[in-house]
Amino acid sequence: MGDNTTHRLRNTIFAQIRKKVGETNHMSFLNTLIDQVADEDLREQLQERVDLIQHKIKFMDRVSVIILDTDNRVSKALNMLLEEVGGSPQDDPIHARVLIYAEEGYPMIQLMGLVPPMLKEEWPAVEFSHVYLWDDNSAMIEHAEQAVLAMEDLAEMLYPGYFVFGNEGQTWISFKTK
């Protein structure tokens, strides 16, 4: 649990997807996943959900964001999805206005006990209380439905009030720092 094996597996999956669709069009990885859905109605529904988010974020500023694991290491496995939902992935929490903690094997309830001592007051996300805990099973995008749900979660976290899919409290929570 919580080891680098999961990160390597996700990075391998992304490498395979990037190889198939090319580096120039990041959104193609979502399209590739959605195109693999056999049920035409479900495929259309998933595409509509993605299109809704994409349309809204066209008119919004990008949000500097970082995803950390339980050792405060940067997790880059979801960077492509972060970019597609209007995030600007960062490598250092000092540059991120939004901080998300997520790691496979660590549900939100467990993260609640681990995160407080890891936070640094000088981080902008901590200063502005933009810290989120993401359930371990939700921060995955290996299948189309998971990817779209993860995209909706990220949209809610990055743009509170602009996107409301009803996932707060179920798949992620806002962790108040002030």
Residue ranges and their predicted role:
Residues 1-178:
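N-terminal ligand-binding lobe of clamshell/alpha-beta domains
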